[in-house]
Amino acid sequence: MRILFSLDNYDHATGGAEMSMQALAHQIALRGHEVRVFQRDRSVRTYDDGPIHVHTHPLPASHLIRDQDLDTIRWNRHWEPLLDHFINETRFDLIVTQNRLLFSTVKVATRRHIPVAVFVRAFSMFCPLQFRSREALTECDRRCETCLPWRMRLKYRFIRRNLGQYEAGLRSATLLIANSIYMRDVLHRFYNLEAEVVYPAIEWKRYESPTRRADRVLFVKPQYVKGLPIFLQIAAQMRDTPFLVAGKIGRHTRRKFRGLDNVECLGWVKHMKDVYARTRVLLGPSIWPEPFGRVFVEAAANGIPSIASARGGIPEAVGKGGILIKDIFDSSRWVEALRRLENPTVYAICAENAYAHAKKFTAAESLNQFIRSVHKAIGLEL
């Protein structure tokens, strides 16, 4: 069977959506299917990613002012004929897509009567601000024009056009796949559409550390939406606890860490397994209602329990392998939870539960969920 992945980003980024799609593509190829990828890139080229044939093509974007909404409109306008021409050369049995090129991909696939599966992993198709600090199911009133900053209001018609095209693409897809039950519920609330749930594929070998010298509390991506102000309060109140911070830190943010001698800032980290080797607890005080929360599963694969916000899809990623905080802006709740995990008995139970929960998110299990969803909706046997 021939399967095409039509994507704006397959392997030139390190986000969860890209890594999950790479893992799925490889799992499908290992089953003997012919897998090709057609992705946006800076130049026209063809190369092999293991058993997968990757083809790239550039798309025009403004060189002066980068604007995601305008670029998305421009990209899809040019991607449609490029994809149409690419499909002329090979007959595909299934097309898989996600994110910014989904509506042009669905349009071409529908016109050619090829089944198309769309992964719903991001908030961009529902909210121009991607619910930076609002809970999508309970706090969004769907009146975009009232909460946009004034600079975005000036291009509101382009924002509405993109949202409309995303909706049209979702409605025309043969199969919709959400990366969590939470995202499935968001899709139903906003567009009254149903989706199958396929959890992200986590390739354990990327994150499992054979040696552990764990004594640190880890915070990943020091950004406001990830809970930076909450973390700073926690670190200031727990001077006796050593913390690690992994992720790029700008000059303005770095100033906020002054005086916190118990915090070690690692900067951007390529191999997270080295960080997990030093981690005893993962801290996730996210203000943003994350669609899933891949980092919690990565940590759990090493038997590391998490203390995390009870928002978005995070509870699904944490499971019973940690402690969830509802009142996220009360730093005392986080401190109390960290103190609880200082108890060896409590920690051992959470660590064991975390490792057991992580087994639900292997690449093989994600593939099985995908196969069942495709067979149910399309009737194809992968």
Where do the protein language model's features map onto the residues?
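A charged, aromatic-enriched C-terminal amphipathic alpha-helix characteristic of glycosyltransferases
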Residues: 73-74, 345-375
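Acidic donor-binding loop of glycosyltransferase active sites
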Residues: 174, 277-291, 304
